[in-house]
Amino acid sequence: MEFQAVVMAVGGGSRMTDLTSSIPKPLLPVGNKPLIWYPLNLLERVGFEEVIVITTKDVQKALCADFNKMKMKLDIVCIPDEADMGTADSLRHIYQKLKTDVLVLSCDLITDVALHEVVDLFRAHDASLAMLMRKGQESLEPVPGQKGKKKAVEQRDFVGVDSTGKRLLFMANEADLDEELIIKGSILQKHPRIRFHTGLVDAHLYCLKKYVVDFLMENKSITSIRSELIPYLVRKQFSSASSQQGQEEKEEDLKKKELKSLDIYSFIKEANTLTLAPYDTCWNACRGDSWEGLSRSQVRCYVHIMKEGLCSRVSTLGLYMEANRQVSKLLPVICPEESLIHSSAQIVSKHMVGADSLIGPDTQVGEKSSIKHSVIGSSCVIRDRVTVTNCLLMNSVTVEEGSNIQSSIICNDAVIEKGADIKNCLIGSGQRIEAKAKRVNVIVGNDQFLEI
């Protein structure tokens, strides 16, 4: 096996707690499928026969119940409930299972990327790391319950690449930078022209050499792949031979002192050094690198920047809504055998359901009810003359006659009574909105009614 695939499904969704307080993030519905289904489906489509899923006991129960139809074997590993593990910690937790290079994905990645483009980059350059990034995009649609709420300032990443746009030369978050951007002279000697991007977003898909995982195992101070390991690997490129030799001498001293923190070069063996023969066919792709440069610089980092297609990380409430808006374009491509409207759904006025809407199994839609740009879950009841526009209704939601719902999320088992008018709201699980009530820009949860 060339790669072992690992899906990280541990994070609690700290930036969308209004949803994840009642539904674990990996199980949040997107297009009537659990969020974690998308990275698992991506792996299955490209031929993986087994994947390691690192998650919690709550998610494990759902995976065992709902994913038994997958051809791919799921090796589910639960972390202790009390553990506060980062992504690097999680890799260390399954270290004994990892025997080859590793492909790591986040459970919140939804993409139609041609995965081989990232993997081929990793292979062709014998890279230590190959990762996926996309151009950042802002949704113009309102976020339910967020109007007037101060938006968190997103910290940009400064990403430097070579003339091919593939070699990753510099990566740092602006929060970690001073007023000046300092580039090592050893990088500029080999790459005098560096192209910087500030509008790229990390998709959290990484190919990692096995020796990188070995390095992580011995360097327990690194807790995050994204914010600690990757910047470290990028910085370690183009280390001079003398500095490497000096490091080796230093490591001998460290071993004598039984200290555990070791440099990445301690874990790069001769077998990992690039040999020219297996890569003759793709050597033309290495235009920015010479054989001499590659052989000396054993740590090599590459990035595939996705310019077209769908690539979204569902890490905020706004991105969650946007994913549900976009998924009607993706599902017919990756699941052509499935209809957007389930065959068991009962719809009286079918012509009033938009072509870009999804309706789940056993849902009933009454006469003259309009559903546009929306996702409706399973076992919902939508009575007559209801209007649903640009919304997500989860499972077992009841909407009584004459109600109007716009740009909102209605969670499981909620009831919207007759004639209610709801706009830009998040209605929590099991909540009831009384008849003819008007709600605008609010979050309604357990013992909660927040006017934003």
UniProtKB/Swiss-Prot annotation:
It comes from the Eukaryota. GO terms for molecular function: guanyl-nucleotide exchange factor activity; translation initiation factor activity. Activated by the chemical integrated stress response (ISR) inhibitor ISRIB which stimulates guanine nucleotide exchange factor activity for both phosphorylated and unphosphorylated eIF2. Its main location: cytoplasm. The modification N-acetylmethionine is found at M1. InterPro entries: eIF2B_gamma, NTP_transferase_dom, Nucleotide-diphossugar_trans. GO terms for biological process: cytoplasmic translational initiation; oligodendrocyte development; T cell receptor signaling pathway; translational initiation. Acts as a component of the translation initiation factor 2B (eIF2B) complex, which catalyzes the exchange of GDP for GTP on the eukaryotic initiation factor 2 (eIF2) complex gamma subunit. Its guanine nucleotide exchange factor activity is repressed when bound to eIF2 complex phosphorylated on the alpha subunit, thereby limiting the amount of methionyl-initiator methionine tRNA available to the ribosome and consequently global translation is repressed. PANTHER family: TRANSLATION INITIATION FACTOR EIF-2B SUBUNIT GAMMA. This is Translation initiation factor eIF2B subunit gamma. It comes from Bos taurus. The gene is EIF2B3.
